[in-house]
UniProtKB/Swiss-Prot annotation:
Cofactor(s) it depends on: Mg(2+)
Organism expressing this protein natively: Mycobacterium marinum (strain ATCC BAA-535 / M)
SUPFAM superfamilies noted in UniProt: ATP-dependent DNA ligase DNA-binding domain (SSF117018), DNA ligase/mRNA capping enzyme, catalytic domain (SSF56091), Nucleic acid-binding proteins (SSF50249)
Gene Ontology molecular function: any one: DNA binding
Protein name, per record: Probable DNA ligase
EC numbers for this chain: 6.5.1.1
Active site: K217 (n6-amp-lysine intermediate)
Catalytic activity: ATP + (deoxyribonucleotide)n-3'-hydroxyl + 5'-phospho-(deoxyribonucleotide)m = (deoxyribonucleotide)n+m + AMP + diphosphate
Record-level GO BP terms: cell division; DNA biosynthetic process; DNA recombination; DNA repair; DNA replication
Pfam families in the cross-refs: DNA_ligase_A_C, DNA_ligase_A_M, DNA_ligase_A_N
Amino acid sequence: MLLIDIASTSLNVGGTSSRLAKVERIAELLRAAAPDPELVAIVVAWLSGELRQRQIGVGWAALRSLPAAAGSPALTVTGTDAAFSEIGAVSGKGSAARRRELITRLFAAATETEQAFLVRLLSGELRQGALAGIMVDAVARAAEVPATAVQRAAMLGGDLPTVAAACLAAGSSGAAGALDSFTLRVGRPIGPMLAQSAGSITVALERHGGATIFEAKLDGARVQIHRTGDEVTVYTRSLDDVTARLPEVVQATLALPVSDLVADGEAIALQPDGRPHRFQVTASRFGRSVNVAAAQAKQPLSVFFFDILHRDGRDLLDAPTTDRLAALDAVVPARHRVDRLTTADAAAATDFLRATLAAGHEGVMAKSPTAPYLAGRRGAGWLKVKPVHTLDLVVLAVEWGSGRRRGKLSNIHLGARDAATGEFVMLGKTFKGMTDAMLDWQTARFTELAVGGTDGYVVALRPEQVVEVAFDGVQASSRYPGGLALRFARVVRYRDDKGPADADTIDTVRALY
């Protein structure tokens, strides 16, 4: 298969608003790739906006000056993927020049259509929230299996390209069996369960229809922990392996009386009095260039387990919350568990929320006692209750500031994700809540994300940066395309641990109106 086949499909898919048309066009390409599992995996990864290599050290700056395009298509898909691997493997002295040389060679062999696709793929412009859902549907269509089966296999396998390759290689008669082979496996990360928002304790109790399990919601970093014997691996919310950076989590896990374990938890930096540090202190321990020993000595992390998905040969994904917590409590000491209260009484739950907030945490999680663990899905079984409304939105553009903020990229344009189209719907602007340090940081960050330069008053951005925004409410507005705007929006923090696919949807905003 040639690169032009994928580039043309991407162009075609981007040019139609019909979800069904997008799905069918991608499914058609997948059927053509089906005889070769590796080819299928590449197609799925690229059209989902991802590289199989994850990161290859090529940023927007490296793509600004490109050679003339080739006259006719000759690049193969597998050859291009191999070129990505070669670029990503470059390191050491002279690596920047060598990487530029390889990029130039690749782009010189690409046609204009292929170059445009490669730029979007390498710069992250293909990453949109709806792509994952469209790709799941396309794989299901091509393999003639239910989309729900593909989604579950991908969540348990942790990797849609791998699932798609196995499913399509098995043919229509064996696809269902291939999907069934993807089960929870210790050592292979799965998509984490996500929570919906609830406006109050009362709402959470009503939605769960009675007694609810309330847990302290810590403002740390989500971790998924796997243990097999004496080997422990730790993954982030985005399924990156951070084992080497979190020795405290490894040590705490090895101290548990288990042989095999998959657990969900939170790593957090605490002050001497037990109150949490601001999130950025915790996040600093996750950097790739961190000196782990020095960072651990300066600011150790604590780990708190709040769910268990597998223990010593028993899968617990489909077990109700009460059973999973009983299995957790049997092996995890209280000092490593989040505070918890089970009640149907709103007053008692409100007191628990107040105590949690007084301890410096951000709110509570309300969990249905009967809910299974929905890997990779946002369900009503988990509800987050915070004292103020917050949303995770994407920064679409930014304006140059004036007065104290002159010379800084300041007023940010906020967008919610449209799950149906993968586009973002603007909800307003804000510069409230920004410190001087934040203004300095975002000026540098948004210069990197700028599309078409930074000379204009309004600087358009690639929709990649997620920001947590607090607000007082949602109001009707004819000014914005979604008909809604946020009241008194202010920046809480930038969420580098989340991507645009994790941003809240416009449907979530509508539900708050």
